[in-house]
């Protein structure tokens, strides 16, 4: 039986990573010289130190040294058998050796004055990751992590929109209207952050729409939830687009493709025995994309490439929407993953 102190330490650990997920993307300090990265990382390092202290107190209270046998590789429950443990240990060793043999060990450890991205910062990342991997055990905790990440993205995205429309109250030295920088101080950084949150928001949208279509009686709470997540997704995508960063846009495209493919493949085994009907659903999604691909040269020669591109992308968007509708309606699950791959290939073929 755990003591009250151990439960308090577990609560402090969870509060630590939730605060990190919420505060680091939003926080910046206009009263310091460097404003963004060093100030964010100073806060992150402090959170990591508090989490380490809470973990050590909990370890002592539980007498965790009695479980030292779990460090043996021969033990089936050993920590070494968990995913990513060995790669993370290898990464820590590489950073330690690189810092030890660096021509400027102090800079390698603490990071540069402008960025503060040194071994100390990397170890802070790893500490928070390790604490989360070791202590997140319930679906409720996972939901809290996802919800916190989505909530943190809202002020970041909204601030980007303010900058784009010229309503930023802060006088930045660079042009943040053509390429928004938001709370990150860099157009690439804000887009790179938001593309990590977009799949989480999209998953909540799928869940909310599924609840709406799956219930016999329409729930106002489900409708409000779906509308809220759709709004959040819209401002996230707009901020990513107005950042003008090509790399994150490519990463977003690859991430959305992978997210959807994993989702559809995971549903393949739950499609039931309606193979003929599921095959028809999959083919029905491919036909519009094939026709759009074949008709695009004709449309391009008639009204121009811009209209042809809009025509093809419109058909692709409608096909993607149809896929998600079929997912929520529990139709065609067996072959939707193949339709998604083929649709992506057709789109890539048109672009190339």
State the predicted function of each range.
Residues 61-80, 213, 217:
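Flexible loop linkers connecting adjacent transmembrane helices
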Residues 1-30, 45-59, 82, 87-105, ...:
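Alpha-helical transmembrane segments of multi-pass inner-membrane proteins
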Residues 69-81, 85, 101-113:
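Membrane-helix boundary/helix-loop-helix interface segments in multi-pass membrane proteins
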Residues 34-48:
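Membrane-interface anchor segments at the N-terminal boundary of transmembrane helices
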